[in-house]
């Protein structure tokens, strides 16, 4: 039983200033497609801003959703974890009407390494966070879709220190760089 409209009414009547809807059921979890028709329905029914979330994987999804729904805003979730450049792409497509060129392999690695440096500069309470082993799944997500990314997964699985990551990046760039 889908209760989004009812919950939207209750939330608004309780004084909420905005409402975010993830367009999937609990049983769906992260599987399947978000129900943007349902999100649009709730947005039409409510006077508070409704922020839609689900299946926003690339910049063109934002344009489509803006055209198809009365949502006041959108929320990006897992797509940003694997492709943080989505925000750059969205800004570009909103300003210019077309998606930008994807970041080069070098640009992606620069971002990944800078992100890793910033994460590792933070104080950690747990000893298990002192090396990069716990970030290996994040590296795989961040390199997904890059040319040759499947071939470097094994190397990413051995990364312990930032220097290891830099070696993987350098070798990957050398092999697949657009400038070579």
Kindly give the residue locations of the regions a language model identified.
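Alpha/beta catalytic cores of nucleotide-metabolism and tRNA/nucleoside-modifying enzymes
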Residues: 3-18, 30, 37, 41-52, ...
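Short beta-strands and strand-loop turn motifs
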Residues: 20-24
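Short, small-residue-enriched loops and turns at beta-alpha junctions
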Residues: 25-32
């Amino acid at each position: 039983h889908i209760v989004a409209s009812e919950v939207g009414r209750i939330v608004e009547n309780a004084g909420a200033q905005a409402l975010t809807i993830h367009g999937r059921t609990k049983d769906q979890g992260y599987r399947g497609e978000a129900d943007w028709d349902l999100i649009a329905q709730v947005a039409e029914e409510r006077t508070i801003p409704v922020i839609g979330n689900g299946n926003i994987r690339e910049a063109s999804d934002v344009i489509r959703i803006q055209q198809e729904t009365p949502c006041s805003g959108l929320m990006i979730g897992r797509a940003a974890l694997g492709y943080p450049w989505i925000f750059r792409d969205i800004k570009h497509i909103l300003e210019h009407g077309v998606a930008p060129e994807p970041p080069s392999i070098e640009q992606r690695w620069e971002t990944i390494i800078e992100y890793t440096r910033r994460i590792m500069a933070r104080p950690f309470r747990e000893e298990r966070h002192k090396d990069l082993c716990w970030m290996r799944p994040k590296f795989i997500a961040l390199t997904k879709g890059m040319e040759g990314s499947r071939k470097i997964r094994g190397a990413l699985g051995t990364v312990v220190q930032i220097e290891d990551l830099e070696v993987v990046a350098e070798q990957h760039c050398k092999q697949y760089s657009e400038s070579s």
